[in-house]
Amino acid sequence: MSNISAKLVKELRERTGAGMMECKKALVAAAGDIEKAAEEMRISGQAKADKKASRVAAEGVIEVYAADGRAILLEINSETDFVARDETFKKFAQEAVKAAHAANAKTIEEVLAAKTSNGETVEEARKSLIAKIGENIQVRRVKTVEAETLGAYIHGSKIGVVAALEGGDEDLAKDVAMHVAAANPMVVSGDQVPADVVAKEKEIFTAQAKESGKPAEIIEKMIVGRIRKFLDEVALLGQDFVKDPAIKVEKLVKDKGAKVVNFIRLDVGEGIEKKEEDFAAEVMSQIKG
């Protein structure tokens, strides 16, 4: 059966998101049976997803969803920023984080098994998206946190932060989350900085201080002062608040009767070796699939 109506092709395209020619080819192979054609395209999509799984996906978005004292952050990667800006990709990411939150998912496996609003799993939606877009799409990281007060902040879809507080309100928690996105602290308080990191900094400061030629007791005071300054720079509570540098974050939360319990910050592509490509190459990769 080669006489396939345009209406049937259009319906299959709307259901699968695939191209017109691919839909017509599938309908011809299925003798006009749209259900069979859709199923064969899903199987084909699975094969395409498997083929693309080895390709580096270092672009993408961070999505955050917070409700009922629980927050979840997802990093979902694509191969190119071109796709990361695509509305279909963004919609998938938003559906995935909502589904993961509803399922109280804490691992990648649990995220992928979570059901989206249309009844399919995140994994099924991911593979369908790969077949449609033609890039490797990966749910790379999931982080969760529970607290009395939560504040979420996303910067340009590339940095996502959740601040967890005891006391205070959501506005305060959002301000803290925004600060974390901008200042990128290592820990909440100075006493949480790993001992080996402090030791390394002390070694560097000691060498620098000795070059000054000052007496030993002065050198010791210099080292203590520099270590204290270092801890303030890398610890959230010791940092100057980005919206009002005249006060420390510690004072900001204390004045509101709150305490910072934890924060989570995800940056798209952290730790992934990215392949440098120019825009023309990126567009060509889209055309070639």
Curated annotation (Swiss-Prot):
How is this protein annotated for GO cellular component? Answer: cytoplasm
List the InterPro entries hit by this protein, alphabetically.
EF-Ts_dimer_sf, Transl_elong_EFTs/EF1B, Transl_elong_EFTs/EF1B_dimer, Transl_elong_Ts_CS, UBA-like_sf
Please state the protein's primary subcellular location. cytoplasm
User: Which molecular function terms from Gene Ontology are attached?
Assistant: translation elongation factor activity
Q: Which CDD domains match?
A: UBA_EF-Ts
Stated family: Belongs to the EF-Ts family.
Its protein name is Elongation factor Ts
What is the originating organism of this protein?
Francisella tularensis subsp. holarctica (strain LVS)
* Encoding gene, per UniProt annotation: tsf
